[in-house]
Amino acid sequence: KEDCPRLVIASLLSEHESLDTIMHMIVAQNIGWDLTYIGNGVPHDEITFAASKVKAQVVVLAINNPRDIARKIYEIKHIRDKAHKTEDIILIGSQSNDYKQLSNDFNINISNDLTSFRLSLERLYSLIR
């Protein structure tokens, strides 16, 4: 899909996979995004590398584990710092609300449910196209 906007979806280290992440992937594909799924428990530098390699406009991070918040904040900041200015970051998952302050400080989107995720992707899709 050369003409479609691209996104990368992954979970940070110490994260587990959930059905929620798979449902978000289905929503993204149904809207028309070209999706690259990296997996769960992925180091932040590999997520950054993959996003640049596929020229992703959006990086989606699934956060479902309440542990290691300080490390995850560091990793999300690193991804934000290394991301191109055209890349948006969206946090999804059951624990994403714990990162509201990070969202405000670093212009990172948080989607609490599938509907808000779909609306965020549709808005970004219209801006990219």
Range-by-range predicted roles:
Residues 94-129:
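Peripheral docking tails and interdomain loops at the edges
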Residues 31, 85, 103-107:
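Short, structured coil segments at secondary-structure junctions
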Residues 80-82, 86, 129:
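A cross-taxonomic marker for long C-terminal extensions/tails that follow the last structured domain
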Residues 87-94:
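Short beta-strand elements of ligand-binding domains
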Residues 1-71, 75, 82:
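Conserved binding/catalytic microenvironments
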Residues 36-38, 90, 109-111:
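General small-molecule cofactor/ligand-binding pocket signal
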